[in-house]
Swiss-Prot record:
Classification via InterPro entries: CemA
Annotated gene: cemA
The keyword Repeat appears for this protein: no
Subcellular location: Plastid, Chloroplast inner membrane
Membrane topology category: Multi-pass membrane protein
Family label: Belongs to the CemA family.
Matches recorded under PANTHER family: CHLOROPLAST ENVELOPE MEMBRANE PROTEIN, CHLOROPLAST ENVELOPE MEMBRANE PROTEIN-RELATED
Protein name (database record): Potassium/proton antiporter CemA
Amino acid sequence: MAKKKAFTPLLYLASIVFLPWWISLSFNKSLKSWITNWWDTRQSETFLNDIQEKSILEQFIEVEELFLLDEMIKEYPETHLQKLRIGIQKETIQLIKLHNEDHIHTILHFSTNLICFVILSGYSILGNEELLILNSWVQEFLYNLSDTIKAFSILLLTDLCIGFHSPHGWELMIGSIYKDFGFAHNDQIISGLVSTFPVILDTIFKYWIFRYLNRVSPSLVVIYHSMND
């Protein structure tokens, strides 16, 4: 009975680790056809206007072509102009297809991650007893560590998260999450998050030391400040 009671939280922990992967794999396949059909039937007209105004001009017309376009039209015979129009039309259709696929990919990943979050939230609520057992194990493990090891672990964690070299790690992590949700890479948004998120974490961590650790384990705070200095 005791073994079964100890095995259940471990099984629950393993299911939490692998459940997001299974949800993503399952819903990606089931939602892709529905989202593709919805996008093709309801969004194609609006999207085409957007492509005509922005992406097509940006990708198909170079600065030099803007100056030479009139000369090309005057000098080329009608057959060459016809081939040119056909080629541009084919490339335009291909570009629209690629952009449609990018938008479908974004909607699909965002929907899948939202569903995954809802399911995991419900799963966590239903498994509240297992979470309490896992929490007690973690607290017992941390309680048995010496203050020196605790201070070293806190110092290592803070240096990784909010230290001098942490922005590079945050940039990779936020970029990966941003990509996982299906959004296109945006340097301005990622740079903004990288510059603000560690500062917020640093403030929260200092408040935690001031309010919690000073009350629970003053010796740990002394060791931490000694190692940090």
